Amino acid sequence: MSYGYFKDEGAMVYSGSDKHNIALSVKSEVNKRLSVTGRINFDYLKVYGAGVAGNGTNEGGSNVDAKFNKMVQILQYRPTIGIRGNDSDLLAGEDPVLSDADGNVMQNPLIAAAEEKDNKETRTLQANGGLTFKIIKGLTFRNNTGMRYQLYRRELFYGDQSIMGRRNGIYGSIRNTETGSFQTSNVLTYDKRF
């Protein structure tokens, strides 16, 4: 049995991920003719924050509209206001120089990170088992069976100060997805040497 916990801080403030993993494996030779194996694995992954790629306008978050890419915003947003202003004005809201610009696509990266929520949770349960039975000398039966069940939840929200909220208004969505699969295989092997 094993347990693992991983915590990563994201490239953007207010972002990162947490992952829990629990696994249990068993292997037993019941007698000379029968052996069994089994494995159960459970993962819980939570990814939070908006990240740095895309503008989130599609489900994959991989929109190629580069002017709204978060990393581009970080690199283009000016770090100081100049000698006639106060640098703290850049941290508190919009850039005063650009606040009246019609069609301005520049966004304070700190405000963007605080106003854009893209939280994803994934729970995955996998179980596999197998048995090998030696029927007679040279004749072996093997069965492998497995299942996978996954729950996925995505909560997406753009506040009124986000670049998307400023252009299109506040909006959000919640998406739940549930998937499952099952597999089995049976193999009969006869091994006779002449």
Feature roles, as predicted:
Residues S17-A23:
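Transmembrane beta-barrel architecture of outer membranes
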Residues G138:
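Active-site and adjacent substrate-binding regions of carbohydrate-active enzymes
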Residues A127:
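A cytosolic small-molecule/anion-sensing beta-strand core signal
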